[in-house]
Amino acid sequence: MNAKTLFVVFLIGMLVTEQVEAGIWSSIKNLASKAWNSDIGQSLRNKAAGAINKFVADKIGVTPSQAASMTLDEIVDAMYYD
């Protein structure tokens, strides 16, 4: 097999591989989007947000509702400058 034939086979293989990978990434993106927007995904995000608010409230000494309304800058200032 000469170099030109090998090069053509390599290019065709690359084109086929690129199309297959594009399909795989598209299906992964669709599955992740469905999982993120599902009821279970939303409830897990809400639980995580509640746990973060409770952790921050315990660290800086405020109520969880106050911690939820604070911006990130306020939280960092309260943790490191008080």
Curated annotation (Swiss-Prot):
Signal sequence residues: 1-22
Alphabetical UniProt keywords: Antibiotic, Antimicrobial, Cytolysis, Hemolysis, Membrane, Secreted, Signal, Target cell membrane, Target membrane
Tissue: Expressed by the venom gland.
Residues that make up the propeptide removed upon maturation: 70-82
Organism superkingdom: Eukaryota
Gene Ontology terms: cellular component: extracellular region; membrane; other organism cell membrane
One Pfam family this sequence matches: Antimicrobial_7
Keyword match Signal: yes
Primary localisation category: secreted
Further facts: Adopts the characteristic alpha-helical amphipathic structure in TFE solution, but an unexpected random coil conformation in water.
Protein name: Vejovine
Record organism: Vaejovis mexicanus (Mexican scorpion)
